[in-house]
UniProtKB/Swiss-Prot annotation:
It comes from the Eukaryota. It comes from Saccharomyces cerevisiae (strain RM11-1a) (Baker's yeast). Belongs to the AIM32 family. This is Altered inheritance of mitochondria protein 32. It holds the Pfam family Suc_Fer-like.
């Protein structure tokens, strides 16, 4: 039984859903700590010698990047492929092979525009079409558009202009700034000048998302834990109707166990409003507790990194 402590949510904008913060009671925490210590020892035994060990006692910071669009480049291959382990370079922008070279090209054409996150993602279920190996098309899923855009490599510049339309008034903390440790965004805005804007149709897929960091070459802790967390989602049948994917680096690799939930609000009205909730120090043994409470509108404070509303 959880002891519930209601707190005021500190966030840049009110969530579309109504959430309460809760804290895990002391007795339950001791049991969780025993499981966590055992799991961390298991993970550390798998890590390369040069990787810093997983330390469950590192304090979880309560901050997330300020953004208004999340662009996911979908990795080719079925869910048993392991691009997150072998194909995603430490820095995705250094990838020269298709399709990942599209990330640096897209970022270049965006010109450092703030408010747009770009990641690679590898789908773990079949609700969205995925590219095949050696596919000539690029598959980008954009949140909160909730649309899959399938484009040619020659369309990247126009696609960047299309994406940037919604970022004109974004704060100046880019995702790259966030990953490099800059905690606060300037409240200034900048003007984006577009050339002729190409409209991209896209195909709508209105489902919630669970994104689990599994970027092995960025930090082996995430690369080892990510598949374990994915397996826990599947074995426990947690949010089985959601899109589930491994995602490249989203910060927080020091403490690892990073999961983003995108929860749609008003999907029946095609409003595309959603809440973005970021968690860290998520382990296979505490994932069920996190998900069950989230489904009931409760956020476990000990794992919460922060969140924003998007529309």
């Amino acid at each position: 039984m959880l002891r519930i402590t209601v707190k005021t949510l500190q966030q840049r904008a009110s969530f579309h859903h109504s959430f309460k913060h809760i804290s895990v009671p002391d007795l339950h925490t001791r049991a969780q700590n025993d499981q966590t210590n055992c799991y961390c020892q298991e993970i550390n035994a798998r890590l390369p010698s040069k990787t810093d060990p997983l330390d469950p006692h590192i304090k979880l910071p309560h901050r997330t990047p300020n953004y208004n669009k999340h662009v996911l480049l979908l990795s080719p291959g079925d869910r048993f492929a392991q691009p997150w382990k072998v194909a995603w370079n430490h820095n995705l922008d250094t990838n020269t092979n298709r399709p990942y070279n599209a990330i640096s090209k897209l970022r270049s054409h965006l010109g450092g525009s703030p408010g747009i996150l770009i990641n690679a993602a590898h789908l773990q279920n079949e609700f969205i079409p995925r590219p095949k190996q050696h596919d000539e098309w690029l598959y980008f899923f954009v949140i909160p558009d909730m649309k899959l855009y399938v484009i040619k490599e020659t369309d990247i510049e126009e696609f960047a202009s299309f994406l940037d339309e919604g970022a004109i008034q974004a704060p100046k903390l880019s995702f790259q700034d966030y990953l490099s440790g800059k905690a606060k965004a300037s409240q200034q805005v900048h003007e984006v000048h577009h050339r002729k804007l190409t409209r991209f149709q896209g195909e709508t897929f209105l489902r919630d998302w669970n994104l689990v960091c599994g970027h092995y070459k960025r930090d082996a802790k995430c690369g080892e834990m990510g598949p374990d967390i994915i397996a826990a989602f599947q074995d426990e049948k947690l949010f089985p109707e959601n899109n589930l994917a491994l995602i490249s680096h989203i910060g927080g690799h020091i403490f690892a166990g990073n999961v983003i939930f995108y929860k749609l609000f008003g999907r029946e009205k095609m409003q595309n409003k959603l809440d973005s909730l970021w968690f860290g120090k998520v382990y296979p043994h505490n994932l069920k507790l996190l998900c069950e409470n989230l489904e009931n509108g409760k956020i476990i404070d000990e794992m919460y990194r922060g969140g924003i509303s998007m529309n």
